[in-house]
Amino acid sequence: MAISIFTLSAQDVVVGAAQVDQYVPLLKGKKIGLFSNHTGMVGDRHTLDIMIENGLDVEVIYSPEHGFRGTADAGEQVSSSVDKKTGIRIESLYGSNKKKALSKEEISKIDIIVTDIQDVGLRFYTYYCTMVDLMNAAVACNKEFMVLDRPNPNGMYVDGPILDMKYKSGVGKLPIPVVHGLTLAELALMVNGEGWLDNGAKVPLQVVKCENYTHQTRYVLPIAPSPNLRTMKSIYLYPSICYFEGTSVSLGRGTDAPFEIYGHPDMKGCDFIFTPRSVEGAKNPPLLNKKCYGRDLRNLDDEEIIAKGLNLEYLIDAYKCMGVSVDAFFDNGYKYAGAKEFFEKLIGTADVRKMIADGMSADEIKATWADDVEAFKAQRKPYLLYEE
């Protein structure tokens, strides 16, 4: 999934997986479970191949949402398989096999779990949820845990409400803001330090830091982290656009610009038109084959997007242009249990839906969580590995 628009602008950044001399000696003689996917690359080589070339014993690969190759749809169940190149089994942790793969019987076969995966730093992006599941599995079996760190492309700021744990779900596992600003290694340290693992347990944890990275580094991803986050602009907009998943509005799945556009057949006063189609990575997108009217955000300046942080202006704009009841707007059409609260699971609180219905502005809504954001920034400070 390497894409031409993804170029490594922060060329001096060295990811954890590239620092072979740091982690290979620590892993020699141990049976390894590797949590990774298509983003676990160092140049043109996968971390799995680097480990094998250095004589390490990788027993099993754990794959997240979208699978080891990163091609499955969002939410699609992924079956377990075998890596064709190495013959190593791949255990999917996003499907019916998850419970068995994380059982004590299976985890007891390895000595350490190593994480190397590119995250995007948002509470509803599921890779960190899988990492926490693996941390819990490791500590339950007295196994070690290691994170080969990678930059957070949304690590420049912290924003959004803290998750109300009554909305804990597969798209939100921890009491953190939507945009937490942490790398996966920092987040793992915080999970351990704050007692967020089951029964407050702590897993034996080692991290290999990135070099030449700060939280203000504009690190451009060399590989798209998932099928519908194809550009840096979509990654920067993601903290503000993803909430459309909990509404009747399309955010562009099934087009060439997912997470960079939004619209609906009934949006009024909008000149931009698009039609979601069945494509790889979005086989059955919302509003499939329906002409949508909406907004095109592709010409927005990246730095302006970053400066505004979590920006609910797009959601409020769509709500006003639809001219429907708040309940109709937040009906995403899915017919599974809990679908009516999917927006709340994404935003993390019951309050925002009512604030939008009451006509509050994006800035007024943002002000309601400002104190919690500052408190979280102080809470996370002991776990930071990089300059803010």
What does each model-identified segment do?
Residues 1-12:
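Bacterial Sec-dependent N-terminal signal peptides
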Residues 57-67, 148:
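Short internal beta-strands
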Residues 70-75, 146-168:
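Glycine-rich, charge-decorated loop segments at or immediately adjacent to ligand/cofactor-binding or catalytic sites
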Residues 79-110:
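Glycine-rich oxoanion-binding loops at beta->alpha junctions
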Residues 119-131:
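Glycine/threonine-rich flexible loop motifs
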Residues 168-241:
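Conserved anion/nucleotide-ligand pocket segment
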Residues 211-293:
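Glycine-rich, aromatic-lined ligand/substrate-binding cores of catalytic
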Residues 258, 263-368, 388:
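Conserved functional hotspot residues or short segments at active or partner-binding sites
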